[in-house]
């Protein structure tokens, strides 16, 4: 599942509709602690697990190692996409985004983006899952640290780096 694509496409479509960037989750979700995992970090952790004999048959949690709250990150995301922050509004992305394929096709043509079918570009159900959680989502990295994996990533930097990568690869305008 790719939360970065959900956020990027949601912001792009909201902007095209002239809407502010509204947090689509519950009020509790907006204030809860949340963790993410950078795919490059996960790849490095998988190599570590596969090559360190102490890791054989051991389960590990792998996250960036920091915590975010959407309430702190949301204004920065809005700024990144050149948008105002809208009021938080619990939105079912699966419903709101269901009829936006033709709009997405126009955005793709207008900005000469890569043509990826709309139903493949973002997992709105995953977005509903992430933004529907009304509680902290925290996984302990203690075991991985005890076994020797100490790498971390800054989640805010991760999001903006990935958004930059999506722009550079013509996935979003």
Q: How does the language model describe each region?
A:
Residues 21, 60, 149:
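A broad, low-specificity signal marking well-ordered, structured residues that form hydrophobic/aromatic
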Residues 36, 42-127, 140-142, 146, ...:
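Mid/C-terminal beta-alpha module of Rossmann-like enzyme folds, strongest
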Residues 130-131:
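A conserved mid-domain beta-alpha-beta active-site/ligand-binding segment of alpha/beta enzyme cores
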């Amino acid at each position: 599942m790719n939360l970065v694509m959900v956020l990027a496409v949601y912001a792009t479509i909201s902007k095209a509709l002239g809407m502010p960037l509204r947090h689509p989750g519950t009020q509790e979700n907006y204030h809860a602690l949340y963790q993410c995992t950078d795919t490059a970090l996960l790849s490095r952790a998988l190599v570590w697990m596969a090559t360190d004999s102490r890791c054989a048959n051991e389960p590990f949690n792998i996250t960036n190692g920091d915590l975010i709250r959407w309430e702190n990150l949301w204004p920065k995301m809005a700024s990144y996409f050149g948008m105002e922050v809208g009021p938080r509004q619990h939105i079912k992305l699966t419903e709101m985004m269901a009829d936006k394929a033709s709009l997405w096709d126009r955005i793709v043509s207008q900005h000469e983006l890569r043509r990826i079918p709309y139903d493949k570009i973002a997992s709105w159900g995953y977005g509903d899952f992430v933004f529907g959680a009304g509680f902290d989502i925290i996984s302990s990295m203690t075991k991985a640290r005890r076994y020797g994996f100490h790498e971390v990533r800054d989640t805010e930097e991760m999001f903006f780096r990935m958004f930059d990568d999506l722009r550079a690869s013509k996935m979003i305008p």
